[in-house]
């Protein structure tokens, strides 16, 4: 039996999975797709991975809410990446203009997934990660550094795929 593809679960996915339904219709839709994908497909189709950086991010904020996020994260394998390697690819992404300096944490998510040869990165961050205008440059920078870039996608997009 072939192994499942790995998917890096970024902070926004965990936040949408565990938060109360938003009053914003668009965000509420993203929350719905996230919960539906998570409950019906995520573990069946993928090996779920994340990182200590996500762990740090989800531990911030309201104590009860952060506890719910951390409980989800406990079930995932956390990928460890050498700081020097992580910083190098992150710097490459920022220096190439794929992400702005203020999005350093977002560059870490992409770098961790690429360095660990993770096939997919699930996110709702369209500004810096799943930005259709930046994806080609992100891919180019990762490949130039010797890494296969992950496919940057949302849980909604994953519902439309046949794995």
Predicted regions and their residues:
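Short, well-structured N-terminal submotif of metal-dependent ribonuclease cores
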Residues: 1-50, 59-70, 95-101, 135-138, ...
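Generic structural signal for residues in well-ordered beta-strands
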Residues: 48, 78-79, 152
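Residues at the C-termini of beta-strands that transition into short coil/loop
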Residues: 52, 82-83, 155-156
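Active-site neighborhoods of divalent-metal-dependent phosphate/nucleic-acid chemistry enzymes
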Residues: 77-135
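C-terminal end-helix/capping segment
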Residues: 130-151
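Short, C-terminally biased terminal segments at protein or domain edges
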Residues: 146-163
